[in-house]
């Protein structure tokens, strides 16, 4: 995959909605600007002098306060801010148009038509699954893809769109002033998933704690899948996910997920009666600790605020695992995935690196207290809220397809 900023999302309700569209649009834009700041060689045509204003525009769109130095908000500053807003709006319009090209190509191909017309309806009903579109949006420097993608639908139903300059398709390459040289690629494929209305917690998995954390945590960098491969190869056979840590105590996130822990704040005897969250809190790492801001992570944090659930935005500590009663990881595909056990190296490597795990042969184990009354009820409660959050804050695909501005 070419080096650049990317995000992945999917549809739900049989392709009628795109999951948390505004979140993913802002995240891939922010990732592009952060990568351009950290790795200017990837985007040589993005002027460094504009990156601060462009990032401020994204933070404002996400509802974050942007502070200016005293006396700085003068006419020049206001003009630069307006310019940055227009540039971000133009960039995001190009991303949106590229997504629509990919979705249209997907739904017009014969393979998708057969799915939609129900040729595999009986099989899907038996599996209680729906066919959805999985979208990957990639922003990279001009020519970074090296012609490695094609505009032709693949037999499996995958569609990859080329930039406009090479494929002649409008809306698939950035043409905004001062953002020239950034190309938009969208890959659309199909995924079978359980309908939201009948979604339940999947069987729990085991996760291994390894590390270190991401080098560019706030940006979704396309080189990460290659970097994480060393961890996936070296993890114990029973582990389905890897939880990242830099020091062997603070747990940051999974390699494709965010991590949550339900922990006791009072002795177990004091929490046996009363509301389900009495004497408990939810824990997840902060963005400042070096994690990628996930869409489901944010939905769960919002749920805690709306429902009065105690939450500590701080990396869960392995040394406090005696207080843990539930654990789960989240992402856009699995939504909420319970974790029943975690493995930790008995000795944390002194020279930590992504390729330093082959020699680890002894692991400590945390096992979830499955005999606790109502085990899993708090994770289920949060899953139900997230489903409602997804439905309320996601974009109707038809609205995007019919919007021309």
Please provide the spans of the model-predicted regions:
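Helix-start/capping segments and mature chain N-termini
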Residues: 1-82, 97-101, 117-123, 140-405
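Signature of the catalytic double-stranded beta-helix
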Residues: 85-119, 129-131
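Long, low-complexity Q/N-rich tracts
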Residues: 124-128
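Extended, Lys/Arg-enriched charged tracts that mediate electrostatic binding to polyanionic substrates
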Residues: 130-136, 146
């Amino acid at each position: 995959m070419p080096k650049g900023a990317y995000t992945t999302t999917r549809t739900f309700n049989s392709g009628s909605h795109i999951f948390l569209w505004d979140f993913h649009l802002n995240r891939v834009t922010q990732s592009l600007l952060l990568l351009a700041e950290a790795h200017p060689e990837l985007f040589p045509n993005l002027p460094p002098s504009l990156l601060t204003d462009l990032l401020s525009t994204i933070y404002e769109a996400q509802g974050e306060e942007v502070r200016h130095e005293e006396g700085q908000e003068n006419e020049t500053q206001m003009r630069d801010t307006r310019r940055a807003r227009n540039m971000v709006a133009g960039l995001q319009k190009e991303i949106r148009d590229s997504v629509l090209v990919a979705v249209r190509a997907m739904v017009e191909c014969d393979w998708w038509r057969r799915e939609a017309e129900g040729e595999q309806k009986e099989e899907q009903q038996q599996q209680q699954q729906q066919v959805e579109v999985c979208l990957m949006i990639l922003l990279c420097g001009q020519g970074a893809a090296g012609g490695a993608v094609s505009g032709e639908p693949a037999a499996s139903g995958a569609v990859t769109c080329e930039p406009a300059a090479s494929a002649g398709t409008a809306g698939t390459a950035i043409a905004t002033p001062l953002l020239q040289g950034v190309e938009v690629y969208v890959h659309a494929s199909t995924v079978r998933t359980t309908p939201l209305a009948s979604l339940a917690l999947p069987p729990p998995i085991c996760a291994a704690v390894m590390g270190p954390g991401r080098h560019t945590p706030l940006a979704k960098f396309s080189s990460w899948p290659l970097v994480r491969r060393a961890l996936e190869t070296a993890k114990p056979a029973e582990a389905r996910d890897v939880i990242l840590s830099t020091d062997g105590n603070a747990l940051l996130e999974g390699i494709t997920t965010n991590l949550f822990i339900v922990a006791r704040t009072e002795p177990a005897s004091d929490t046996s009666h009363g509301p389900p969250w009495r004497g408990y809190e939810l824990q997840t790492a902060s963005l400042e600790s070096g994690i990628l801001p996930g869409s489901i992570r944010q939905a769960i944090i919002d749920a805690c605020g709306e429902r009065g659930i105690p939450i500590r935005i701080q990396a869960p500590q392995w040394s406090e695992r005696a207080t843990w009663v539930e654990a789960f990881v989240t992402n856009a595909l699995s939504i909420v995935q319970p974790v029943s056990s975690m493995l930790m190296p008995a000795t944390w490597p002194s020279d930590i690196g992504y390729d330093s795990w082959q020699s680890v042969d002894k692991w400590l184990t945390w096992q979830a207290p499955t005999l606790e009354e109502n085990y899993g009820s708090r994770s289920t409660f949060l899953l139900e809220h997230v489903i409602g959050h997804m439905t309320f804050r996601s974009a109707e695909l038809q609205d995007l397809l019919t919007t021309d501005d």
